[in-house]
Amino acid sequence: MASRVSDTGNGNENKENEGTVASDHSEARCSYILFEAECSDGGDDEESMEDSLVEDLVDDASVHQGNSLSLFHAQTVEEYEGEIQSLKRKFILSPLHRDVAELSPRLAGVSLEENRGKKARKSLFHDDSGIDSSAVEVSQLSSTPSAPGPDIRLPKPSDIDLEPLFQSRQRCTHMYSKFKAVYGVSFTDITRPFKSDKTTSQHWVVAAYYLAFDSEISAMEVLLRQQCQFLYIDNNDGIILFFLEYNVQKSRTTVYNWFTANFHYNENRMLANPPRTRNMPAALFFYHRFMGTGGIKHGAMPEIIVNQCVVSNQQTDTFELSRMVQWALDNDLQDEHMLALEYALLAESDGNARAFLKQNNQPMIVKNCSIMVRHYKTALVAKMSISQYVNKRCLDHGEADENSWRGIVHFLRYQGQEFLPFMCKMHNFLHHRPKKSTLVLCGPSDTGKSYFANGLNKFLDGHVLSFVSNGSHFWLSPLRGARCCLIDDATLTFWRYADQNMRALLDGYEISIDAKHRNPMQTRAPPLIITTNEDIMRLDEFKYLQTRTMYVYFNKPFPLKGNGQPLYYIDGYTWNSFFRKFWRHLNLKDPEDESDGETPGTIRLYTRADTDTI
């Protein structure tokens, strides 16, 4: 390799010499290596670079990436929708649905078909994914031109954020606090908590959270009008408040199912309880909402609200025992449990009943009312003659069929009894003739003795004696105040007991009856109806009872139809027709001749006054 000649004093000469040396030795050597680059002050290099045809290998310009995430999202959605389109041919709305939407969005919200929404699915992207609103929008291809339609339920950021909250254990706390923040009153202060979802009520207060659109509320109004006497709907800050007075009573489960079936609501986002019926602040809250201009109202205001807000109703809510006793007498109620229940149910329309429910000593009031009713009824019945009493019992059974009495006559003939002797025994029985006031129905089993006797005793509102309680000193206490009495299925043991201890009772004379916690009371023995399988007329040991009883024999089996029903139907209405038909034959007098212008068996304890609503 040739040595390089270097001269620092003259740069140009060195350059020329180097080129000469290189050219001279190019043929003899394989390559020429330049170890250093020489600096030069000239501009020849720049000019040569401008004339070069080699492009830059590195681009240092700023590069804009673009919204690739939005594009990927759009492509993913388009691919997914394409797969769904191939599987479900009804995915795209038909032109008919679009025409209905163009005519009226409200009309499109009302449909008789089941609204089948898309099932929830897991998605990689949500609407609040952080993509800026100014990102590139990818238009969705459609075979038909777009048209305005009804509100479509799309997942909203508020729905996505609140869904875990409504699924948590604290959802009720959040819902109660949200309701109080919006309406200024707690939901529990205006409603009664029902622990069971099966308990029914006619009035319901429903609060729905973040569920409905305006078109759905209009559809609700149309559908609820068919089921409710009164409805109120108010949409305020994401909470829809319903006050519903249904035509019939419904349970919480039924209310939830209706909203779920028609509008696909989630039960976790709803509260439902009946309103408070005896709470003035709650009534004023609803009254203020109903009288306002906001919300949707339909129908007359419920009575449970009017009764608490009207002045006249508040002024008359003072309890009077006499009014309760009068009501019990008019409705023929004297059992304590029935008195308490029926009078409590009357609270919606009667001020005295509402005042009764506000009392703290309701058991004592019910007991006193039952005692007073029993005293009044006993005294009224004791004052009546037998004609007045039978007429009252006929009136209590209402209008009778004119020909139903024939069933009694045909049954007696079927058993071989002559009608005239039976009428004589009935005459003595009703008029309480001494030694002729005990009617005995005797015969084998299954001959209709008890059926016949119970029908007559029930019509006369008689009492029942059970010999099974003869070990007690008070087993004869039902005889007090009774117009007749029934002893069913008497055996030889009873007849021996009656022969020793009850001869005066069978005679129909005055007897002394021992009652619990009372002194023995003297009263006249009522007429008796006795059914038995023992014919004491053929036994000499009962000769003292044979003159005190009137026997009627039933020897044939009781006739039945093919379906098991009695051939001769005998009940209270049949006896009503019987006594009306043979009134004169039984020597019963006209009630108007004995009453002296007064209706027997009635009493007026207080003067009823009409109150006008202010």
UniProtKB/Swiss-Prot annotation:
Name of protein: Replication protein E1
Ranges where the SF3 helicase domain occurs: 403-567
Similarity-based family: Belongs to the papillomaviridae E1 protein family.
PTM comment text: Phosphorylated.
Keyword Cell division in record: no
Motif Nuclear localization signal: where in chain: 88-90
GO molecular function: ATP binding; ATP hydrolysis activity; DNA binding; DNA helicase activity
